[in-house]
Swiss-Prot record:
This is Ribonuclease 3. The keyword Cell membrane does not apply. It catalyses: Endonucleolytic cleavage to 5'-phosphomonoester. It comes from Oceanobacillus iheyensis (strain DSM 14371 / CIP 107618 / JCM 11309 / KCTC 3954 / HTE831). One of its GO terms (biological process) is tRNA processing. The active site is at D49, E121. The gene is rnc. CDD domains: DSRM_RNAse_III_family, RIBOc. It is found in: Cytoplasm.
Length: 228
């Protein structure tokens, strides 16, 4: 396996080339090439899983100083879950660099979510061993962490549902969301939303979409409630 195209694609040069090869080697390939005494990526995936969890935990702790532990746990789980890891790997085109057995390749292994997710974690494990934790953080700062500011994981932080649950504890209260302002050109709008409970403004938030603005308004309301 010539890993130079992979290194060029990633913009990263490995000192220990064998680690990068191993990160992209599936067990099905090893099983079909037993005489070569190759290693699959499962051990690196195990390591990468731990490295990713620590990196995400550190990022959330440092960049969300007012976020409670429970919310950080939910958000971290959304970032490190298989569907998210699969998406990261797809965006980086990891599938085309995988070493798969013929059977796995013929049955769509290059697009299989579990294989892509494992390869992403294995790559992080290899990067950690080759270049250290700081370089893993640099990689995630480019390819993963910016997604947190674009609402990619907003499904994990459904503040509207949390606020609705609170309001339902007081049966007579009515909750309503209003878009009170739209700013910017049509191709780059910013919306300002207000959440109203019992005809009283309870929170305000901004976002690139109406839904994002409403979620942030709900979070603002919840923060006010929790701090009162």
């Amino acid at each position: 396996m010539d890993i130079r195209p992979l290194e060029e694609h990633l913009g990263i040069s490995f000192q220990q080339k064998a680690l990068l090869k191993e990160a992209f080697t599936h067990s099905s390939y090893v099983n079909e090439h037993r005489k070569q005494r190759l290693s699959d990526n499962e051990r690196l995936e195990f390591l990468g899983d731990a490295v990713l969890e620590l990196a995400v935990s550190q990022y959330l702790y440092r960049n969300n100083k007012d976020m409670p532990e429970g919310e950080m746990t939910k958000l971290r789980a959304a970032i490190v879950c298989e569907p998210s890891l699969k998406n990261f790997a797809e965006e980086l085109e990891f599938g085309k660099f995988l070493r798969l057995g013929k059977g796995e390749q013929q049955t769509g292994g290059r697009e299989r979510p579990a294989i892509l997710a494992d390869a992403f974690e294995a790559f992080l494990g290899a990067l950690y061993l080759d270049q250290g934790f700081d370089n893993v953080l640099d990689f995630l700062n480019i390819h993963v962490f910016p997604k947190l500011t674009t609402g990619a994981f907003s499904h994990a932080m459904d503040y509207k549902s949390q606020l609705q649950e609170f309001v339902q504890q007081h049966k007579d209260q009515k909750i309503e969301y209003r878009i009170i302002e739209e700013k910017g050109p049509s191709h780059n709008k910013e919306f300002v939303a207000e959440v109203v409970i019992q005809e009283k403004a309870a929170g305000i938030g901004t976002g690139r979409t109406k839904k994002e603005a409403e979620q942030r308004a709900a979070k603002n309301a919840l923060d006010s409630i929790n701090n009162s």
